[in-house]
């Protein structure tokens, strides 16, 4: 090889190496989630991203804030495109994660689950909603998502308003209704409520679970039998009755869950039935009264589950980086951080939790899960149920749908 050939080869190699370095330096890690910025999990995940940046200084991190509704309505389209991120928060359940898993749009994580020690953080109970069969039904099949938190629906209540009238936390449905009536007699609408989004179904399903046993929950969530509508009929009758008595405002049909949360946090309503994702907001914004939570009185089941999951799209360009990020989210430091911000962390060290809200929520979640009382969510069984339940519940509140018509729509 003559000198000119050697020079040409050397120059060519240099160009290739330079291109490779430039490509490595320009690698972009795309991550999405829909948790509101002030929630404990979002704050903790943001800190995990900062740690990620220090561990991967050659990677550009591109975070995008999404909404729950965006991914609920367009998840399949996004995941089935070249615009999918490397990792994203996704809702669990047959109708959401199950649907896209059955379409082959998610990366199986079983190998990473064991290799990276995630099985030491998450037990079988924590991962039952991470597995979906070929039909998209939860409980078996490959692991396609990793939860990093728990969540449940409870009754947020204004301690000051309760104490001013000598009221105790209700322990039965009858006592709960008596509390509603007490406030209404004082001219106060007792329940903050919104039917425009997922808040519509939380109260509805909570009331249905007052009439549910193990068989009903398993049949409903696992599509094991035709729908027994009796618990939903009871729930629909209660909501219609509570609207007629003024326990729920008819104006709720114009409110989102965040609007209803603002009604509670501003002190206008003494109670709000919603999920633990409100804790960060309430801890930061409620300054004029004391507040807490209690589990709605049911025989066993509470609306809730392990939280939303991080999934890795089949089309993700940087899967190893996605796994590294999940490592950080599941780390003891990040889980403790989440708990001490008031979150329901799955892998936190109880001895390390000093935050009052975080400690309460971890304890309540343990109380529910230890008795096998996680009833999941009503929109999970089949795709399209989310929108159907919102429309049908809105009809109950505005009077355009009777309880009997409501349950007919669910079949």
Task: For every predicted segment, state its role.
Residues 33, 220-221, 342-351, 362-411:
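C-terminal capping/gating helix-and-loop segments adjacent to ligand/active sites or protein-protein/ligand interfaces
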Residues 95-152:
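Hinge/lid segment of periplasmic solute-binding proteins
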Residues 180-183, 221-252:
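Glycine-centered hinge/linker elements that transmit conformational signals in sensory
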Residues 54-55, 81, 141, 245, ...:
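Extracytoplasmic/periplasmic substrate-recognition and gating elements
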Residues 135-148, 153, 177-224, 240, ...:
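Extracytoplasmic/periplasmic solute-binding protein
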Residues 110-125, 212-234, 283-286, 295-303, ...:
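Short, solvent-exposed loop/beta-turn-alpha elements that line the ligand-binding surface or hinge
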Residues 34, 47, 95-98, 202, ...:
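Extracytoplasmic/periplasmic substrate-binding proteins
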Residues 12, 24-105, 115-120, 169, ...:
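Conserved N-terminal structural module of periplasmic/extracytoplasmic solute-binding proteins
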């Amino acid at each position: 090889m003559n000198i000119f050939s050697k020079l040409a080869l050397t120059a060519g190699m240099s160009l290739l190496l330079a291109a490779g370095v430039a490509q490595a330096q320009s690698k972009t890690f795309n991550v999405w989630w829909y948790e509101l910025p002030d929630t404990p999990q979002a704050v903790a995940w943001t800190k995990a991203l900062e740690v990620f940046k220090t561990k991967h200084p050659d990677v550009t991190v591109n975070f995008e804030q999404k909404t729950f509704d965006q991914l609920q309505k367009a998840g399949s389209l996004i995941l089935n495109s070249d615009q999918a991120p490397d990792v994203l928060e996704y809702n669990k359940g047959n109708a959401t994660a199950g649907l896209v898993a059955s379409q082959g749009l998610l990366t199986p994580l079983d190998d990473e689950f064991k290799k990276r020690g995630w099985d030491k953080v998450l037990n079988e109970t924590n991962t039952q909603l991470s597995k979906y069969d070929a039909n998209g039904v939860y409980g078996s099949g490959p692991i396609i998502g990793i939860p990093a938190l728990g969540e449940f629906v409870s009754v947020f209540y204004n301690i000051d308003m309760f104490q001013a009238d000598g009221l105790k936390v209700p322990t039965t449905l009858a006592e709960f209704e008596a509390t509603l009536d007490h406030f209404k007699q004082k001219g106060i609408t007792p329940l903050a409520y919104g039917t425009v989004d997922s808040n519509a179904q939380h109260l509805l399903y909570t009331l249905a679970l007052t009439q549910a046993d193990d068989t009903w929950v398993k049949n409903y969530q696992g599509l094991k039998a035709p729908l027994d509508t009796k618990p939903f009929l009871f729930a629909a009758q209660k909501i219609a009755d509570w609207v007629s008595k003024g326990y729920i405002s008819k104006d709720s049909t114009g409110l989102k869950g965040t609007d209803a949360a603002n009604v509670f946090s501003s002190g206008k309503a003494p109670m709000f039935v919603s999920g633990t994702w409100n804790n960060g907001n309430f801890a930061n914004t409620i300054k004029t009264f004391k507040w807490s939570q209690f589990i709605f009185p049911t025989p066993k089941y509470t609306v809730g589950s392990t939280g939303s999951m991080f999934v890795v799209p089949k089309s993700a360009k940087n899967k190893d980086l996605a796994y590294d990020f999940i490592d950080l989210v599941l780390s003891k430091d990040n889980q403790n951080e989440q708990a001490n911000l008031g979150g329901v962390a799955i892998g936190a060290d109880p001895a390390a939790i000093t935050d009052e809200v975080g400690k309460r929520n971890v304890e309540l979640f343990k109380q529910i899960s230890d008795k096998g009382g996680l009833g999941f969510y009503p929109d999970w069984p089949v795709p399209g149920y989310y929108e159907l339940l919102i429309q049908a519940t809105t009809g109950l509140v505005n009077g355009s749908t009777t309880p009997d018509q409501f349950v007919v729509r669910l079949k």
